[in-house]
């Protein structure tokens, strides 16, 4: 995966997550955050669980 592909895919996932009303659909938002964490794990080699938890804290606090 190239840097441009990563940026485009991540931007699309973040955009989709931002459009979801997290008050009524928190599980859907968490699913998108898991996809973002999985993508970052694949591209950057970041630890999936750690990054997933960081994203949860960032989006839900």
Give each language-model segment a name.
Residues 1-8, 21:
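Short, charge/polar-rich alpha-helical segments
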Residues 12-60:
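Acidic, low-complexity, intrinsically disordered interaction modules
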């Amino acid at each position: 995966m190239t840097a441009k592909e990563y940026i485009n895919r991540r931007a699309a996932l973040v955009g989709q997550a931002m459009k979801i009303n997290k008050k009524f659909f928190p599980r859907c938002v968490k699913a998108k955050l898991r996809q973002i964490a999985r993508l970052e794990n694949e591209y950057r080699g970041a630890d999936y669980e750690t990054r997933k938890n960081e994203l949860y804290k960032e989006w839900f606090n």
